[in-house]
């Protein structure tokens, strides 16, 4: 080396030390480092503060101000003192209160020094209070002639930035008496700094007139009559008039006037008087009734005059629903008064007349008739017998179908005839594989159809097992020496089946499975959908490789480092010896350069262990043992005593200077590592712990030197008092004093503790009417007294008792029936008050007002001059009527004569119910017989009506007679036959047709067939023929002719017969996506013309790999479509190309002489295949494995 430890080096210089090492083969290595010796400066800078305290004033409520000042400066023995921090700077914003600004300087050796400037920002109050007036103008009304009124209002208040604004004067207060006219009330406030502020309230007292005019109505209701259909009439009447206490009442509006046109109905005419000198309004109404008189009967609408319903032959009748007749009337109302039947009633076979009678409110009647015809018909379909609903036949797989013979369905009918009109197939037809539904349709002579079906199932049966293809042959793989086997990948056998599907049901192994060393037989088993099975087998052989792998040596502890005390030359070292493992299971130690417990010199020694396996492969392990001489003794520290210092209470911190700790070390050098504070630093109020830590050049650290700096605060500031506003409270007039509760003033002190020294009153004390001054004085724990807190308690006496009211009793009065209102006079309610004055505020009616029939509520409200309102005085005025007039019939029916059909025993007779009028209203109109009663042929009955009004008075002057006689005018009722439809096979003409003949009935009991154009069993040509029947009764009444049609249709109903083809299979090379396929197309034959309707593919089309269904559909000229012919074209792929392997080049590595093996990493070979997948079956080695010195062959095997 160029230098030795312990050698002397010059201050202020940097020296490079070089170590050189040489081995036995003259290989050289070097280590170099530098040693720098520096002189240390420990004297801090000197700080100069030009002005230690600066004071600025701001307005009360201002948060602070920007302050400019001369900054402290510093000098140092090094000639350089750098400002490293300051808590504020000139021009910064400073909040109200005291702020300490600290400046810290440092010399180039890192010695710090501090100086402080105290900034005091003080609030000064020059702002007057802010006065709030809830309402600047207050208006009160008094009766004309009153001199004034006591007025209550919410007083103005004031706020101030000091938190206290005191009321010093007011020219009036709430509850004072204010004369008629305008009075200005002034309030003056002042804050603790003497700044004044004022606010005013204007009181307006106004005289008003509140009595409305009195209106007189000569006649409240006027009635006029007009003809029905008239829109109205001009009406003349005497108009209402009005008087007022002012001597003047003006008519300001009226909704109509005498001579105006009034429409039919009730019209209310309103007269409004107002605009007396005070503008008080009053209203009155006149009711104009215009009444129509009606003599026109309702108009009846019958939606359907004749309704026909059919019933099964032998059924007596049926319940019939229909839309009922309706009626309209010029009055807007037409009431149904009778009906002989209603929707839903049971009607017998034959004809029934239903009569509806309507009547309007004036008793005018009107009738309408609905005829119900119930006809017997045959609607029962034939009954079909199917010998066998489902027939199943089996065919070989791939056969398109088979001819099937079966017993055909038959049919019977209540008419005795059931004809087969169509069938979709017949016995002996060819049926395709699958399910075919054969439909048979029968029809009776009345055209009622019925159908039956036979299902033909043709099923394919499969007995051929799948064919298994094993493409791999024997599979041979190698396994590393010592392993039990290897995972082997191979191409799996595949299977095909004539059904198109062969499922793998079991396998004894699969690609990637682990195979042991030796030969293993692998078996695959497949099964088709019919349960036919087939197997395929092959052999997998695994061979073991030769051992070339050296033992693996494990050095458990790694390199070893030990220390000795400075001056010792060697050390005995104990360690865990390296171990070795080998794939053969045996590794022997053949040599070692040292062993545990040997003496190792100061410095680094290399230790090597060598192991060998039975095949002679060697493995080596190395580690180093380093012995280092070190210094372990820490420095000795001289620590100072604790430091104590006082500041003003409220000051948060102060700079403190103290003597720093020193240290000594046996090496001659002790360095300050860290310190938590330095002389001149700012310390907060309280106790702060300061720590210094020293260390020597060997890193030995002494125990920390810790001492405390304690800053104590002294209090000289009086408490701050939160005074309260003046307290105001009202009492009942005449009360001398009252107990008052208020929130007491509070105080706050920077010491956190205040006490109440004295108070002149407390919450809950009794205060007299007037103003009482209350004073609170607070002090803190240091005896600093705050300024006294003074406020006023003001007690006001007011009147809160409402007047006492003498209310009137309820009033009842009667008038003649027909009058609508009456004028009522009464003694008005009165009121008294403790103040001596009570006045009427409002009333809903006055004596002499006109009140309508019924009960009217009258309300009076009184108040005193203090605004106390009494509860409302409420009573009722009730106007009743008296009736002395008997009712009078306004209409009565004439005598009634009615004819009925011969054989009918009688009929229901309806008439318009008589009407009657009465001023009191009609309570009831009753009679011995009602409209809609049944009257017998030959009978003459008297009908009498009695009317009674709501007062019990009666009139029985309405009576009339009802007479019924019989006449035959009705023709027979015919039940006609429905149109007949029959189908024959194409080419058949004519055909015999059977049908049910029309029938007729008559009320006389005899209906005769007069003529017919055909009879059942006649032959009819293809096309439509008309058949007519005519009936008459013995009285010569002929019924309308009964006509119906017979339509014979020739129809082709047989679909074409299709010759379908079998499924097609093609094979292509793997990677080919599709192939062109040619085939013979399906064909079809038909009784008429068979044609191809659609096909999903055709010969020569390209078909993709997979199963492709192809469908052909055939039809004939009659629209009969055969079942679709469907077959499949399957395109399979086959792979015969082995994978393409990308191998890597030979690898050569050079190792140190004596090394037996080395780990080698490389990029593994890869393979691709046209199938998209190439699988690694086995490999003799892996990247990173140890390879011995010499040549080793590495093998990789791939397959698809």
Swiss-Prot record:
Disulfide bonds: none annotated. GO terms for cellular component: extracellular region. Pfam families: HYR (PF02494). GO terms for biological process: cell adhesion. Glycosylated. Coiled coil: none annotated. It is found in: Secreted, Extracellular space, Extracellular matrix. InterPro entries: HYR_dom. Keywords: Cell adhesion, Extracellular matrix, Glycoprotein, Repeat, Secreted. The keyword Secreted applies. Residues 1-39, 40-123, 124-207, 208-292, 293-376, 377-460, 461-544, 546-629, 630-713, 714-797, 798-881, 882-966, 967-1050, 1051-1133, 1134-1200 form the HYR domain. The keyword Ribosomal protein does not apply. Homooligomer in presence of calcium. PANTHER family: FI04643P-RELATED, HYALIN. Major constituent of the hyaline layer. The hyaline layer of echinoderm embryos is an extraembryonic matrix that functions as a substrate for cell adhesion through early development. This is Hyalin.
